[in-house]
């Protein structure tokens, strides 16, 4: 008997390595876990594919979906809207697939109100200096944008205590191992195993 998938909320300030950790994690047994593809009104970055990285839509389309109550969470970040489809999340979890939401603390708060079993993971950088170095190293943003992201990072990180797990991404491989351990542990909880191993447990306890 297969068990329902777990919903993981993964948050971090921009530049902490959250997206890299999630994408690397998904390369291992991608059939049992996937990242939720959010809707957004921002323009695609180089290399991003519509429907794979995000569903890129207009502001008008996004507001129409809000009116339809189609999102489990949505937020405005740096002047752009981001949202996560309710229906897609539920259908995926019912298939026994773990789902990862790459969202900020505001979105996490909304999701937790609707799905109390969601598991929060916050990724922290080892220092502000390292975070700024990573943002600068991308070569994508102006100094003004980087300064704005650094200010936003402090605000984002102040909400770390709202999450069940904290990972410091000082060493990428260690951070990846920590994230993998969290996911594995949730598959081994009593509630999950009671469902997944029901037939075996019934047989073991039979007279």
From Swiss-Prot:
ATP binds at residues 12-19. Coiled coil: none annotated. One of its GO terms (molecular function) is ATP binding. Its main location: cytoplasm. The keyword Mitochondrion does not apply. Residues 5-184 form the Guanylate kinase-like domain. Belongs to the guanylate kinase family. This is Guanylate kinase. It comes from Shewanella frigidimarina (strain NCIMB 400). The lineage of its organism: Bacteria, Pseudomonadati, Pseudomonadota, Gammaproteobacteria, Alteromonadales. The gene is gmk.
């Amino acid at each position: 008997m297969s068990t329902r998938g777990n919903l993981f909320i993964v948050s971090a300030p921009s530049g902490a390595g959250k997206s890299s950790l999630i994408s690397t994690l998904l390369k291992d047994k991608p059939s049992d876990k996937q990242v939720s593809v959010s809707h957004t009104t921002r323009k695609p970055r180089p290399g991003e594919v519509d429907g794979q990285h995000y569903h890129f839509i207009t502001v008008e389309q996004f507001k129409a979906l809000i009116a339809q109550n189609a999102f489990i969470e949505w937020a405005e970040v740096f002047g752009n809207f981001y949202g996560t489809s309710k229906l897609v999340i539920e259908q995926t979890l019912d298939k026994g697939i773990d789902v990862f939401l790459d969202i900020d603390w505001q979105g996490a708060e909304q999701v937790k109100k609707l799905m109390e079993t969601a598991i929060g993971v916050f990724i922290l950088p080892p220092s502000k200096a390292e975070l700024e170095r990573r943002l600068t190293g991308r070569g994508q943003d102006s100094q003004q944008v980087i300064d704005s992201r650094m200010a936003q990072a402090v605000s984002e990180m102040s909400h770390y205590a709202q999450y069940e797990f904290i990972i410091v991404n000082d060493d990428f491989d260690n951070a990846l191992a920590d994230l993998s351990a969290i996911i594995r542990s949730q598959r081994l909880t009593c509630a999950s195993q009671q469902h997944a191993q029901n037939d075996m447990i019934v047989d073991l306890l039979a007279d």
